[in-house]
Amino acid sequence: MPTLRVRNFYALRTLRWPLGGVSVLTGANGTGKTTVLLALKVIRAAFDRGLPEAVSQTLGGSYNLRNHDAAEDEPIELGLELDDLSWHVRLRTRGATVDYLTEETLTLGGETIFVRDSLGNFVYRGERQELVPAAAERLGLRWVTEFHPEDADAARLSNLIRNIQVYYDPDLRGLRESGSRAIEDRHLHTRGRNVFTMLRKWRDRREDARRFDFVDQGLRAAFPGVYDGIDFDAGQTVTARVYRPGNETPNPISHEANGVLSMLMLLAQIASADRGGIVAIDEPEHALHPFAIRRLVDRARAWSRQHDLTILFTTHSPVLLNQFNAEPEHVFVLERGHEVLPVRLDELRDRNWLANYTIGELYVDSEFAANENI
C-alpha cells in the first residue's frame, strides 16, 4: 500500500496518508483537500518534465508555496512510500520558481539507492554520477529509471508515479460547445476535455473495450430512465449523442443533462487508470442526484477491486460520505489541531459511537471537519 507524504506545502503542514482501495478525504474549507491533489499532480508532472517546470505549469510558480507556519529554513517535502521503499524530494525555492538543485532520496529500508544533495551531487548505489545539464533538471528517479532499467526498486516507484492521475474542475461547458479534439487520444486530460475522443477510442479498440463498457454500464445504472447508449460524430472534433430508452433518435450532448455529462466524465476518469494506479478526483458530487452518487461509489469499488486501483475522492457531500458508513476506516479527515493529517474517522471518533449515526449526518452537524473550528 503506497503512502503519500507532504510537509510544509501550501495549507499542509504534515501529511502522511496511506492510500488504498476507495477512500474519501474531507475537511473544512481551506484545510487542504485540493492541496493534496495538487501534491499528487506535482509529483506526476515532475516525473515527466522535471520539478521546475512541474511547479511552474501546475502551480503557476512557487510564490507562497511554503506553509505559513513553517520556518524559512524548513524545506517543502513531497514523497511516496511503497512497502519498504521511500522516495522524497525537498524543494528549495528561489524567486518565482524552484531551484533544480533539489534534494532527492530513494531508500530501501536502511539502504540508500540514490541521493542528490542541494549542490547537485548525485550518488547512485555508492558511486558518484556526472549528469549532463538536461538530466540534472530531471528527477533523479527518472534518470535512474532510464539509465538503469534493471533496477527493480527504482522501477517500482517509477511505475507508481507514472500511474497517478488527478482530475478536477471538469470542463462540461467546453464539451457541450466544442466537443473533444480528435487527435488528443493518448490519455484523458485533467479537466476531461478529450473525454469523447477517449471513449470512442476505447469503444473501437478491443483491448480497451472494457473501459468503454464500464462507462456505458455505469451510466445505465445511474440513469435507468434517461440513458440507453451513446454514439459519436467525428471530424476534427469528436462530439457525442445520447440515446434514451424507447427512442431511436439520439439527443446531441449539448442538450443533455449536466448530471449525465458529469457522471460520464467521472466514470471515464476511473476507467482511464491502468492496473495498480492511483486516481484522485476532486468533489465528484457536483450535479449528481443522490442515487447517481451511490451508483458511482458502487461502480468505483467494483472497478478498484478488479483492477487493484486506489481511488481517492475529496468531498463535502453527506450523501457520498454515507456510502462509507460501514467503512469509517476509509474516511480521512483534515482536522485542525492534529499534528499529522489526515486522521482516520474511526480514530478521530470511537467506532462504536459512529455506528449510531450516519457519517453524513455527523458531518452536517459539525461533529468533525467543522468550518466553525477554523
Regions inferred by a protein language model and the residue ranges of each:
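Electropositive, glycine-dotted interaction segments
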Residues: 85-217, 221, 225
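Phosphate-binding P-loop
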Residues: 14-20, 271-273
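Conserved P-loop NTP-binding catalytic core
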Residues: 38-100
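N-terminal pre-Walker A segment at the start of P-loop NTPase domains
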Residues: 1-13
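Conserved ABC ATPase signature
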Residues: 212, 220-224, 228-271, 278-291
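The start of beta-strands in P-loop NTPase/AAA+ ATPase cores
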Residues: 2, 277-278
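Phosphate-binding glycine-rich loops of NTP-binding sites
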Residues: 21-60, 257, 262-269, 299, ...
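C-terminal lobe/lid and adjacent interdomain/linker elements of RecA-like ASCE P-loop ATPase modules
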Residues: 295-374
